[in-house]
Swiss-Prot record:
InterPro entries: Gram-neg_bact_OMP, Gram_neg_porin_domain, Porin_dom_sf, Porin_Neis. Residues 1-20 form the signal peptide. It comes from the Bacteria. Its main location: membrane. Keywords: Cell outer membrane, Disulfide bond, Ion transport, Membrane, Porin, Signal, Transmembrane, Transmembrane beta strand, Transport. It is found in: Cell outer membrane. The gene is ompH. Structural rigidity of the outer membrane of elementary bodies and porin forming, permitting diffusion of solutes through the intracellular reticulate body membrane. GO terms for biological process: monoatomic ion transport. Pfam families: Porin_4. One of its GO terms (cellular component) is cell outer membrane. This is Major outer membrane protein. It comes from Pasteurella multocida (strain Pm70).
């Protein structure tokens, strides 16, 4: 589950970990390094069991105090593995440590009591929306513009539990006459309050982006013809609310999206329940209902996820998680799927 954490200049370097090691702190300049190795042993229906990298990373965070509450910041995050895909875009291999690459790379400014403004390859505020996903790797229905390789992102400081912001993402194609695939914006608001042992959260976001759509042809295309694409807008919104008491939390999210000139919408509802048994152990469950397509030709999905997590140490986390899904297409044909995984995360 993603929590809204906003705290002056330090929070501006997103994903700050309490376990970060400060390697330099002098004359207003601070540099932190942290990371984690995340491994997952997974078995999916009709596939072989496999051991894979589940997002291992190393991050570097730097901030420079400019005075008067203003600071400059920079963030770089390295990942170590990339899926191998075939020509149709299907994943055929998931190696471990086959590709060291920069997953995030951005810089910007933070102003105390106002917020942060960053530029580069980063998550947007849209990624913060969602309260019902308590899982480690199977849950989540976020449909917003949540990241961009060329993004400008603003996130406010917290004002009595309220945080808000927006982001603009540039298209990868700088050709003026080219497709604008990926270009768009997102705005979001996050509200979190806690009174005693009772907590409440409400989050909402809206985004628009251009997506590439194939131009339909009345006649079958001749052999050797080139597929033609055009830009269409995808409009999406997501809302969620969470109620918590002591170690028990219940979250509900709803997401919907629609592409211009494409029949039908995508809708999804996720309900999550999490119970922290103590500081080390938790159990959780998630239910997801989704449907896609025009009336009379709708595909429906149902999923249930169960899991438990246990911390062997404040920096060593283990978990087991299983999911069972059922999809029913427009013709009434039902397909079932299941997956189970055991994971280990060692933070440093």
């Amino acid at each position: 589950m993603k929590k809204t954490i906003v705290a002056l200049a330090v929070a501006a370097v997103a994903a700050t970990s309490a376990n970060a090691a400060t390697v330099y702190n002098q004359d207003g300049t601070k540099v932190d390094v942290n990371g984690s190795v995340r491994l997952l042993l997974k078995k999916e229906k009709d596939k072989r069991g496999d051991l894979m990298d589940n997002g291992s990373r190393v991050s570097f965070k730097a901030s420079h105090d400019l005075g008067e509450g203003l600071s400059a910041l920079a963030y770089a995050e390295l990942r170590f593995s990339k899926d191998v895909k075939n020509k149709d875009g299907e994943v055929i291999k998931q190696p471990i440590g086959n590709n060291v690459h920069a997953k995030r790379l951005y810089a910007g400014f933070a102003y105390e009591g106002v917020g942060t403004l960053t530029f580069g390859n980063q998550l947007t505020i849209g990624d913060d929306v969602g309260v019902s996903d308590y899982t480690y790797f199977l849950g989540g229905i976020n449909n917003l513009l949540s990241s961009g390789e060329k993004a400008i992102n603003f996130k406010s400081a917290e004002f009595n539990g309220l945080t808000f912001g927006g982001a603009y993402v540039f298209s990868d194609d700088f050709d003026k006459n080219g497709l604008r695939d990926g270009r768009g914006f997102v705005v979001a608001g996050l509200y979190n309050r806690k009174i005693g042992d009772v907590g409440f959260a409400f989050e909402a976001g809206y985004s628009q982006k251009y997506v590439k759509q194939e131009v339909a042809s009345v006649l079958p295309p001749p052999p050797g013809s080139v597929t033609v694409y055009k830009d269409e807008k995808e409009k999406a919104f997501m809302v969620g609310a969470e109620l918590s008491y002591a170690g028990l939390a219940l979250g509900v999210d709803y997401a919907q999206s629609k592409v211009t000139n494409v029949d039908g919408k995508k809708r999804a509802l996720e309900v999550g329940l999490n119970y922290d048994i103590n500081d080390k152990a938790k159990v959780y469950t998630d239910f997801i209902w989704a449907k896609e397509g025009p009336k009379g030709a709708t595909t429906r999905d149902r999923s249930i996820i169960l899991g438990a997590g246990y911390k062997l140490h404040k920096q060593v986390e283990t978990f087991v998680e299983g999911g069972w899904g059922r999809e029913k297409d427009a013709n009434g044909v039902t397909t079932k799927d299941n997956v189970v995984g055991v994971g280990l995360r060692v933070h440093f």
